[in-house]
Structure formats: structure tokens, C-alpha cells
Amino acid sequence: MQLRFAVLLISLAFAFSAVPLVSQVLHVTPDADPPLAGTRSSTVPRIYHDRGIRDIDAIGNRNIGCGRGIGNWYSLERQIAMGKEYSDHVEATSKLVKDPEVSDYINAIGQNLVRNSDSLVPFTIKVIESDDINAFALPGGFFYVDSGLILAADNEAELAGVMAHEIAHVAACHVARQNTRGKMMNMASIPLMMIGGPIGYAGYEALTIVTPLTYFKFSRHFESEADFLGIQYMYKAGYDPQALTAFFEKIKSLETTKESKVVKAFRTHPQTPDRIEKTQAEINTLLPPQLEYKVDTSEFEDAKARLESLENQGRMRSQSPSRPTLRRREPSEAGQN
């Protein structure tokens, strides 16, 4: 009895000591900015950003969360290795666009955004032949853009806005920080297992349910941070940041009308009025208007035309029989030979 009581005390001490540790990983740091001008504090989610990531002039020379420490247990080398493993699977199960003009054009947009970002890793950018309106960047800078996203964008700035958002996830090491968060949750569950009994089991069961949800889906704070960094990157690269909110509105319309196209990239990026309003307020507050922005280019129109041509060719191939069509001979025809 005394031994069990001693174990209980040790477990509780470990659990309470882990609470501040986990809270530093799971919650936004207290050093936050006041609400943005133009936001309605009663309706817009209060997700503030650290002062350090608000300095646009310091892009590329500021710490936005990739430093090793309590919130990130993954080195850049480990993140690159992780991303390479995932990218091998992606390319083994996907069909890449082979058109060099399209590939080179998308790569040029992406590399320009990367140069104007906080990324500490080089990027490899490829286009996947898919109708999905999707783009995703893996840890270590392995970036894939679906052809459906290019065709869905009305101009180059909209495409650049989505790409900048995904680049921001890598620049801020969100996957590494999310995985660290999952490991911290697992560590916090150890004392609960040691306690035993109904209370300990219930607590452990709750954590095992929560952990996968936080492991595979970015938190609201990380998504907000990617929006915030993304508009900075596209702005610094010369694009009109309003194009990102315009694309958000388009995706919101597709969601409400239940269009048949699969909007995979935004199933975990709900285009709520609050999110759109908050991004717009950040643009108005943080980014001084420029005399001119890059919005559209002839290269964008050429790339869309080439992809539409490839799409039509693929549709024609799927409709054309790849082998002779056979017809069953009718009995009445048997005696005609």
C-alpha cells in the first residue's frame, strides 16, 4: 500500500511538472500583439502573432520557430530526411507533369517566393497531373502543386498566394513542431498509465484519442501563422496580397455550392468569414500599399493553356478504345458465310 502511494505521488509530481512544458508547446506564447486594426474582437478569433514575425524587413534573418528547443525537437537534417521519404512515396503514387515549360514556370514562381521567405532549406518544386485543387509542401522543401490548382486560379498572384502559404508551413517548421507536440502529449500520458485505475485509464485513453488529431492536422494557430507569413512572402516577392483573400473567397464558394472538384488542400483550411476577415485586416495593417503589383503574366496564361491541352488529350485517350471493339455475332448471320 505504501509503495503504491509513493508511486502515485511520484507520478503526480511528474504530471504536474510536465504541465508547463506541454503548455509551452500547445499554446501561443504570451508575448502577443494587440488586436489588429479593423478586426472585430468579439467575432474574429484572437490568434496573435509574436512580434518577431511582424518585421517584414527582417524576413530571412528572423527566428520564426525553426530553432531547436522545447517546441521543436527535429533538426533541419532530420526534417529533410523525413520529407525525402514522404516525397518518394508521393512520386511513386502520382503522375508528374512532364511538360518542361509548365514545370519550369511553376518552379520559377516557387523559387522566387522561397527567396523572399524565411526558409532555411532549398526547395524542389514539381507539378502533379491531377484535377484536385491542391498544393502541399513536405518538410525539407519538397513541394508539389496539382495541375487542378493552376487551372482553378484566375491569375498568377492567386496561385502565388496559395504557394506562399504552403512555403510558410515549411519555413516555420510546422510539421516538426506538430510532431514535437504529439510527442509531448505522449510524454504527459506516462504518469496517467502509472497511476492506473479508472481515472488513470480514462485520462490516458483521452490523450490517445487527441494525439492523432493533433499529429496529422495543423492547429488553428499554425494555419493562421501560415496565412500571416504567406501574405508577407507574396508581398515581398512583388504580388498583390489581396489575391490570396480573393482565392479564399473562391474556395468558400466552391465549398458552399458543393462543386464536384475535390478541394483537398482546403478541407483542413476552412474558409470561414473570420479567417478571411482576419487575413484582410492583417494586409491592411501590416503591408503598406505598393504603387504596382505583379498580378498576371502571359506565362501564366500559356501554362494554363498547355495544361488544358494536356487535360483534353488525356480525356480523348480515355475515350478512345485501346484495343479492337468486339461484337457478338448474331445467329442469323451464321449462315451467310
Label each region the model flagged:
Residues 1-8:
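Bacterial N-terminal signal peptides that target proteins for export
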Residues 21-337:
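A Zn2+-metalloprotease active-site environment signal
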Residues 8-20:
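Bacterial N-terminal signal peptides
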